[in-house]
């Protein structure tokens, strides 16, 4: 089974991730992981910290000469900003007192964590709750992307909305969508919408405010049959949704036509089935988003994630001082104005991990060679139907 765990605080010395279950024999280049980390850091509206950090990964175990061994892969990403936080974030005792944070931000983990863990300073909560943790997830996702690539499965994403500005890609060729998204500073393939998004982010920043939005993630060439209908926790869409909704500030996840299906009749809600000797079973529409009955159906898996506006505002909201219980402004903590473009990259990583996990559960194999053999046998059986 493929699984990963992360450790590290936002302003601590660094982030750690250990991923288990990757089959032996997979080539993983650290440069490819660094590329994914760099994609996560880009985007108009990111905060000053992105000028400090240049994330790169260091692999400590589980690989030899760029090839996986089948044992746990341990990776480390240094926080270059730690030099400015050594006293505040020291894991050992310090000589002088550190001023506690006591004015929780609405929408963040500050107050719930303060109550749950009984701390005296909610920095103990926010440091781990921070979206900085997603850098470790992106590293794990990059490893899983390398595995999926061996089976010609690819994951791409774009920004479809920021604030009240929505992209129109109805007239854009599919291959151009992904190209234009990568060269846009907000990862939006609609040039006109992209410029409006930039202006909107600029205005929000000037007001000390933040913005949310939506990203669309598409996974191509997923074989039919990943996931299962047999138990609630084996359903592929359920597993993907849990992974995606766990991303900081993501508040909704939709598959295919998503919430639009609420207003459609059944005849317009589902994807009719066709058959061709060359293509096999196929659909002319993809309202299901590539998953039916908790299983992949062979069509592209299409997911939309909605991200709320970041709760760290330069112009803080109303709050309460936890020590005095008096009215106060929430803590003003350095943050992004808009991180929607980055969420697309984190969502790609989350999906990569879950699909790699489902792929290995379906086809097994301690080595990549065995896994490929099993996949080929399965594809031949499907082709013969």
From Swiss-Prot:
GO biological process per UniProt: amino acid biosynthetic process; aromatic amino acid family biosynthetic process; chorismate biosynthetic process
Binding-site list for NADP(+): 40, 46
Named cofactor requirement(s): FMNH2
Pathway(s) it belongs to: Metabolic intermediate biosynthesis; chorismate biosynthesis; chorismate from D-erythrose 4-phosphate and phosphoenolpyruvate: step 7/7
Keyword presence, Metal-binding: no
Pfam families named among the record's database cross-references: Chorismate_synt
The keyword Plastid belongs to this UniProt entry's keyword annotation: no
UniProt keyword list: Amino-acid biosynthesis, Aromatic amino acid biosynthesis, FAD, Flavoprotein, FMN, Lyase, NADP
Enzyme Commission numbers on file: 4.2.3.5
Positions that bind FMN: 128-130, 248-249, 293, 308-312, 334
Catalytic reaction(s) noted: 5-O-(1-carboxyvinyl)-3-phosphoshikimate = chorismate + phosphate
Ranges annotated as spanning the membrane: none
InterPro entries listed in its UniProt record: Chorismate_synth, Chorismate_synth_AroC_sf, Chorismate_synthase_CS
Family note: Belongs to the chorismate synthase family.
PANTHER family the record matches: CHORISMATE SYNTHASE
Function of the molecule: This reaction introduces a second double bond into the aromatic ring system.
Entry protein name: Chorismate synthase
Taxonomy of the source species: Bacteria, Pseudomonadati, Elusimicrobiota, Endomicrobiia, Endomicrobiales
């Amino acid at each position: 089974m493929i699984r990963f765990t992360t450790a590290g605080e936002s302003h601590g010395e660094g982030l750690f991730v250990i991923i288990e279950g990757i089959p032996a024999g997979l080539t993983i280049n650290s440069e490819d992981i660094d590329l994914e980390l760099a994609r996560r850091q880009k985007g108009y509206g990111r905060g000053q910290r992105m000028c400090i950090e240049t994330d790169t990964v260091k692999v400590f175990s589980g690989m030899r000469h760029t090839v996986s061994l089948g044992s746990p892969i341990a990776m480390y990403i240094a926080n270059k900003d730690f030099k400015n936080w050594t006293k505040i974030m020291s894991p050992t005792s310090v000589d002088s007192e550190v001023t506690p944070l006591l004015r929780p931000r609405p929408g963040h983990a500050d107050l719930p964590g303060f109550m749950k863990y009984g701390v005296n300073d909610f920095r103990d909560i926010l440091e781990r709750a921070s979206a900085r943790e997603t850098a470790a997830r992106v590293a794990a996702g990059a490893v899983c992307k390398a595995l999926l690539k061996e089976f010609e499965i690819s994951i791409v994403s774009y920004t479809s909305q920021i604030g009240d500005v929505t992209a129109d890609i109805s007239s854009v060729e599919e291959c151009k969508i992904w190209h234009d998204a990568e060269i846009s500073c907000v990862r939006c393939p609609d040039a006109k919408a992209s410029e409006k998004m930039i202006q909107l982010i600029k205005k929000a920043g000037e007001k000390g405010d933040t913005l949310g939005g939506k990203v669309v993630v598409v996974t191509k060439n997923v074989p039919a049959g990943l996931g299962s209908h047999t138990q609630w926790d084996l359903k592929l869409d359920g597993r993907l949704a849990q992974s995606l909704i766990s991303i900081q500030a993501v508040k909704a996840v939709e598959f295919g036509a998503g919430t639009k299906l609420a207003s459609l009749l059944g005849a317009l809600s589902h994807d009719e089935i066709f058959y061709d000797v060359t293509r096999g079973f196929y659909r002319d529409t993809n309202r299901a988003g590539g998953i039916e009955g908790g299983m992949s159906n062979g069509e592209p898996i299409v997911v939309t994630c909605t991200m709320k506006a970041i709760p760290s505002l330069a112009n803080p909201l109303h709050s309460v001082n936890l020590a005095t219980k008096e009215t106060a402004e929430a803590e003003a903590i350095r943050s992004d104005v808009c991180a929607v473009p980055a969420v697309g990259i984190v969502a790609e990583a989350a999906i990569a991990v879950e699909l790699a996990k489902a792929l290995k559960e379906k086809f097994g194999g301690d080595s990549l060679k065995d896994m490929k053999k099993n996949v080929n046998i399965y594809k031949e059986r499907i082709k013969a139907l």
